[in-house]
A protein has these predicted regions:
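Intrinsically disordered, low-complexity polar/charged tails and linkers
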Residues: 1-144, 150-152, 158-180
Length: 180
């Protein structure tokens, strides 16, 4: 299995039927709210280093996590803070992963033009005047791989760590068979 680095996991949970963002911002120190900038409320945690965004529809979005335990802990932490100030929260809150961003370094320089030609043209996009990498879509895994000439690969769009690892492993195998 490929040794990938998780850069960010984004997840959400429906923690309430509705949240009075203004009321929460008045009662909860440390929660940031500026209705002119953003309709939601933000709280940043230091351990783990994540941000939780709260929305009027009762959704909580967690971003910045490096692992699934950090997401679970962070959402529970915010739920507990909300309960302590009298906010009605659902008794059971499921967490759904929306996106995992992971990276891997092949450790060698890559010729993106050659790779683009060798891979399925329908699944690749290279416009180096607009973006310095090759965009390769793996629809079967829901993954998009950003491939850079430095050999760094960034995988986005997956909802499981195994899928990120599998997508990068498939790409590594394809690149290793190319005569470039």
């Amino acid at each position: 299995m490929t040794n990938i680095t998780v850069e960010n996991i984004i997840a959400y949970s429906k923690i309430a039927d509705a949240l009075d963002i203004e009321k929460i911002s008045e009662k909860a120190p440390g929660f940031m709210y500026d209705p002119n900038e953003f309709t939601g409320l933000t709280i940043k945690l230091n351990a783990p280093n994540v941000a939780i965004l709260l929305f009027p529809d009762g959704k909580a979005i967690c971003t910045g996590a490096k692992n699934l335990d950090d997401i679970d802990f962070s959402i529970k932490e915010v739920v507990n803070k909300l309960r302590r100030i009298g906010i009605k929260i659902k008794s059971k809150t499921d967490i759904e992963i929306q996106n995992i961003i992971a990276s891997f370094d092949l450790g060698k320089e890559l010729n993106l033009s050659s790779i683009s030609k060798a891979l399925n043209i329908e699944n690749t996009s290279i416009e180096q005047d607009k973006f310095p990498g090759l965009v390769y879509k793996m629809d079967e895994l829901g993954a998009t791989l950003l491939i850079f000439s430095s050999g760094k690969i960034v995988c986005i769009g997956v909802k499981k760590l195994e899928d990120a690892s599998k997508a990068i492993e498939i790409l590594k195998e394809k690149i290793s068979t190319l005569e470039i």
